[in-house]
């Protein structure tokens, strides 16, 4: 089943990562990149979880009662499935790194330049393909999308007021120009 692509604001939301290894670290960093309040629960930490709250202890369901969402990223597939089942039963969004069928959401591979976020998702079927596509896209897009977005946003209201129904065509021309000119827009 394909997952519906949606972008949500997770700034200051309580997000829990269960597990202390490399995959847990990568997932925690993704969440931190978007301002989440990340708590890592693990009996053993194999990584440094800078920026996260850390509960160095065995996982208990009480740990995640206040969670907006949970990432089950232990090296124990059975435990990840049990965590996912608990989350589903308690209406907590959950991602399991060991079984896509346990997930109520997936974490996309993404490119971020300021407020420009481009994500690639394979509905949990092939994270390797998602990564490959992300790396491919990174090679073909300009490195100044954030600047272009800021410039477009700065004139957006004026364009709508001046051009009304033709604004979409004007934006297309401005974006084409910005792609060719390092994010800069024509003056005037």
Q: What do the PLM-derived regions correspond to, one by one?
A:
Residues 49-65:
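Glycine-rich, highly charged phosphate/nucleotide-binding loops
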Residues 124-188:
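An accessory alpha-helical subdomain
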Residues 38, 54, 93-94:
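Hydrophobic beta-strand scaffold residues
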């Amino acid at each position: 089943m394909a997952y519906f692509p949606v972008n949500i604001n997770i700034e200051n939301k309580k997000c829990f990562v269960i597990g202390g290894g490399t995959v847990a670290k990568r997932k925690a960093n993704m969440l931190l990149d978007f301002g989440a309040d990340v708590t890592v629960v693990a009996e053993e930490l194999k990584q440094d979880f800078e920026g996260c709250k850390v509960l160095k202890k065995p996982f208990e369901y009480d740990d995640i009662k206040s969670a907006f969402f949970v990432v089950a990223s232990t090296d124990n597939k059975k435990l990840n499935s049990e965590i996912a089942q608990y989350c589903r039963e308690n209406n907590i969004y959950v991602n399991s790194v060991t079984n896509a069928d346990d997930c109520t959401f997936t974490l996309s591979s993404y490119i971020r330049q300021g407020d420009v976020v481009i994500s690639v998702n394979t509905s949990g079927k092939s994270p390797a393909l998602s990564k490959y596509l992300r790396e491919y896209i990174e090679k073909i897009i300009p490195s100044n999308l954030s600047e272009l977005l800021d410039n477009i946003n700065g004139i957006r209201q004026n364009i709508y007021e001046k051009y009304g129904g033709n604004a979409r065509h004007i934006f297309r021309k401005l974006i084409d120009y910005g792609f060719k000119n390092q994010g800069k827009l024509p003056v005037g």
